[in-house]
Amino acid sequence: MTRYKATISYDGYAFAGFQRQSHARSVQEEIEKTLTRLNKGQAITVHGAGRTDSGVHALGQVIHFDLPYQIDEEKLRFALDTQSPEDIDVISIELVADDFHCRYAKHSKTYEFIVDRGRPKNPMRRHYATHFPYPLDVERMQIAIKKLEGTHDFTGFTASGTSVEDKVRTITEASLIVDETGQFLTFTFSGNGFLYKQIRNMVGTLLKIGNNRMPVEQIALILEKKDRQLAGPTAAPNGLYLKEIRYEE
């Protein structure tokens, strides 16, 4: 068997998430169906580095799969790209070692979250940015977001009832920029891993801080108390993008 690593992007609007599901459309299943056709009907299993939720997009998701033969990477990329649905793009494919695993190999992830604060909202962006038409103090949010950097127990920012026991993660970058029109905010988070709904919960909290309904110090309090009830609401999934996954050499 020959193992291939692929970088893909997808529009998450019409998917119930990356992971295969029994009664809903998923990115994993669509790619497996295409690979199975290319493999003359013999089933191929796809593994993903991250499990994006329903409605979440990806600019640089990484997958791997095994084929019973070796083929030129660009020919394989072209075939997989052109025969996959239009809301999936295959950016690159490369041969990797047989023991490479896209999920367990040491890596970092970068996510972006886009907020549209336009009045009125832009209907063309409704599936690709979360609308928040209320007053926001960007400077307050820029101060608060920096308090998320570093190694912390992020229990207070994960979904209640998550089965993951170790909730300590390291965020190497947490930043917020505003585009030149002032309408779109981009939150960026890079780190060694993120908990279930962690980024959406952090963004929901930051928006509440920006709207002066929480103090800047709330971030430190949530990290200290590890209490989800102290954080803001979960931001909608449509603004979230898995931007990039980087593997250590």
UniProtKB/Swiss-Prot annotation:
Reactions catalysed: uridine(38/39/40) in tRNA = pseudouridine(38/39/40) in tRNA
EC number annotated for this UniProt entry: 5.4.99.12
Biological process according to GO: tRNA pseudouridine synthesis
Coiled coil (UniProt feature): none
Domain of life, source organism: Bacteria
Molecular-function GO terms, alphabetical: RNA binding; tRNA pseudouridine(38-40) synthase activity
Record keywords: Isomerase, tRNA processing
Keyword Mitochondrion listed: no
Protein name: tRNA pseudouridine synthase A
Organism expressing this protein natively: Streptococcus pneumoniae (strain P1031)
